[in-house]
Swiss-Prot record:
The lineage of its organism: Eukaryota, Metazoa, Cnidaria, Anthozoa, Hexacorallia. This is GFP-like non-fluorescent chromoprotein. The keyword Nucleus does not apply. InterPro entries: GFP, GFP-related. It comes from Condylactis gigantea. The modification 2,3-didehydrotyrosine is found at residue 64.
Length: 227
């Protein structure tokens, strides 16, 4: 791990899928520091622009899907960095409280100083009059994922809040499974939390988007009762 990942790494992302039957493709590039847990991405829609839905539902598949860029504190073993050079995959189902569902599969590999992400998504049942299809969302609130091991893989559970103009936030529930492609056993982390913040500093005409994410893995800050 130490010799493969540097303090500055490049990112390339290739995404395709459908949302409510509408097909699209995106490509992007970026950079970040895996050990500080910060990253930037620049993503362009290459097929299907302008998108007829809010890109916000895809941004967690990009930044929040870029699991190598997490600052692990308190000696928490880093499952994702240990997985190189082979890499890892993840699957995620996001269930929105208005009925929308987004499923995603991502493959992470390493080529030189560049992390390669290949993502496939399927979005269904987003209401025509909802904030996603009306494109009135305004980014994500910060959130926290709970992470735990389960028979050699990592599971993640998270509740995210999508900001909506003039309305309460749209809540969604995320269920993620992370799988290393490395054949040998890894040092598994115990139950912990991963705090994350996704921002979109810039976008153009629903066809170009810039993302920033910061993420920190930690144990609970609440002390146990002394015995």
């Amino acid at each position: 791990m130490a010799g493969l990942l540097k303090e500055s790494m490049r990112i390339k992302i290739y995404m395709e899928g459908t949302v409510n039957g509408y097909h699209f493709k995106c490509e992007g590039e970026g950079d970040g520091n895996p050990f500080e847990g910060t990253q930037n991405m620049r993503i362009r829609v290459t097929e299907g622009a302008p998108l007829p839905f809010a890109f916000d539902i895809l941004s967690p598949c990009c930044a929040y899907g870029s699991k190598t860029f997490i600052k692990h504190t308190s000696g928490i073993p880093d499952y994702f960095k240990q997985s190189f050079p082979e890499g890892f995959t993840w699957e995620r189902t996001t269930i929105y409280e208005d009925g929308g569902v987004l499923t995603a599969h991502q493959d992470t590999s390493l080529e030189g100083n560049c992390l390669i992400y290949k993502v496939k998504v399927l979005g269904t049942n987003f209401p025509a009059d909802g904030p996603v299809m009306k494109k009135i969302s305004g980014g994500w609130e910060p959130c926290t994922e709970i992470v735990y091991q389960d028979n050699g893989v990592l599971r993640g559970r998270n509740v995210m809040a999508l900001k909506v103009s003039g309305r309460p936030p749209l809540i969604c529930h995320l269920h993620s499974t992370y799988r290393s492609k490395k054949a040998c056993a890894l040092t598994m982390p115990g139950f912990h939390f991963a705090d994350l913040r996704i921002q979109m500093p810039k976008k153009k005409k629903d066809e170009y988007f810039e993302l920033y994410e910061a993420s920190v893995a930690r144990y609970s800050d609440v002390p146990e009762k002394a015995t």
